[in-house]
């Protein structure tokens, strides 16, 4: 796991939490929850790759891991679209920077998950 990605996740979540305090947007709450879920999934997949040979454990624990992987990619695509939309409509520079960083992070995480999944297949 790239330490920069981990700190990026923490930074984005902290920034979104600050934005959440200033707004009552349920969409933002959902985005934060999905970011947290995505981070946990990415971390667990990365740990499985690091333990190589853990594929059988992963498959036994979750026989539908490929389906789950597909769902995570759908979540990432949804988050990318949601972040792009937010970026277009916000005029607040703090929010713009946060959403630009979140977008970059999503692209990086999508690539990492693809790399991890190819190593597990």
Swiss-Prot record:
SUPFAM superfamilies: Nonstructural protein ns2, Nep, M1-binding domain
Pfam family, one: Flu_NS2
Motif (Nuclear export signal): 12-21, 85-94
Family note: Belongs to the influenza viruses NEP family.
UniProt-annotated location(s): Virion; Host nucleus
Record-linked Gene3D superfamilies: 1.10.287.230
Function: Mediates the nuclear export of encapsidated genomic RNAs (ribonucleoproteins, RNPs). Acts as an adapter between viral RNPs complexes and the nuclear export machinery of the cell. Possesses no intrinsic RNA-binding activity, but includes a C-terminal M1-binding domain. This domain is believed to allow recognition of RNPs bound to the protein M1.
Main localization category: virion
Presence of keyword NADP: no
More details: Average number present in a viral particle is estimated to be 130-200 molecules.
Organism the protein comes from: Influenza A virus (strain A/Hickox/1940 H1N1)
Cellular-component GO terms for this entry: host cell nucleus; virion component
Protein name: Nuclear export protein
InterPro entries, per database record: Flu_NS2
UniProt keyword annotations, A-Z: Host nucleus, Host-virus interaction, Transport, Virion
Record's subunit section: Interacts with protein M1. May interact with host nucleoporin RAB/HRB and exportin XPO1/CRM1.
Any GO BP: exit of virus from host cell nucleus through nuclear pore
């Amino acid at each position: 796991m790239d330490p920069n990605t981990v700190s990026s996740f923490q930074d984005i979540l902290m920034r979104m939490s600050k934005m959440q305090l200033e707004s009552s947007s349920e969409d933002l709450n959902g985005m934060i929850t999905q970011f947290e879920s995505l981070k946990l999934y990415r971390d667990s997949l990365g740990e499985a790759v690091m333990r190589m040979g853990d594929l059988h454990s992963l498959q036994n624990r979750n026989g539908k891991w490929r389906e789950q992987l597909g769902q995570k990619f759908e979540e990432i695509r949804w988050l990318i679209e949601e972040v792009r939309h937010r970026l277009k409509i916000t005029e607040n520079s703090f929010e713009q920077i946060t959403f630009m960083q979140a977008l970059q992070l999503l692209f990086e995480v999508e690539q990492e998950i693809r790399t991890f999944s190819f190593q597990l297949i």
